[in-house]
Amino acid sequence: ELWLPAQHFRACLNAFTKLSKGIWMQQEIIELYNNQPKTWTAEHKALFNEFLSALNIGKIRSCEKENGIWKVNEWVKMGILIGFRMGELTTYQWGMDKLFFDKDTLPEKQFSLDDKIRIVPGGSSARNGCYISSGVTIMPPAYINIGAYIDSGTLIDSHSLVGSCAQVGKNVHLSAGAIIGGVLEPIGMRPVIIEDDVFVGGNTGIYEGIIVQSKAVIASGTVITASTPIYDSIREKFLEYDTGKSFTIPANAVVVPGSRPMKSNPNFQIACPIIIKYRDNKTDKAVELEQALRK
């Protein structure tokens, strides 16, 4: 006969309840996305609000790592798109006299001191439905879109954008003017993923499902897309497409802007970011100095 102490039984019951609730939400979202009603009911709006709350606290996310592989949670993207479909344009007031207009299902995210997020005054904004961990610093102006996930210790510098569903790891430095592209559709398309301890230089752009693995350095002015060839000068070869039909920047890689001659006309050059080296003590010291300056 199986016997469990009361506290173990309660823990198992709570875990089962959470799992069941998560599966129920997923099924309801998929059903609602595939069979859009003619009118949105109070029950539909309650489901979306519960979904949004789960996004806000990081309980669910649009993409997550399982057994070392990044997996897109398509149903989460479906839920976000439901919010756009369901919402009606409304007026929001910002400050004393500033008005802006957006869907009534997707207001600006609100923060409190208890969130332990440093938000320097001057015009930053985050859309409801993004997750921002404690210990994150946001310099003005910056924008974080719905579905984005930003882990602890990360710095979002001035004029930076974290797009919809983009995933940003721990202790990442997004320098001024860095753009981390977002994606909602196609549903199955992987968002941009910036793993832990990555340094992204100023005026960079990373788009179209690129993965930047841990401790990589993306130099200022580098633009990386799924259609831009990337050359590894250390291994003397071009990066190949990964399973997400995009590129994965290897861990510790240092990537700088570059170019190569066009095949059709070698008198002209096209963009080609170059991995010039992999991180060493000199690179680490430069990154550590940047981290010290922001504390």
Where are these predicted regions, by residue range?
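Cationic, low-complexity basic patches in intrinsically disordered or flexible, solvent-exposed regions
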Residues: 2, 8, 19
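Intrinsically disordered, low-complexity regions enriched in polar/acidic and amide residues
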Residues: 6-7, 25
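Terminal amphipathic alpha-helical/low-complexity segments used for targeting or macromolecular assembly
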Residues: 21-117, 246-247, 251-253, 257-295
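Structural signal for interior beta-strand "rungs" in well-ordered beta-sheet cores
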Residues: 113, 118-263
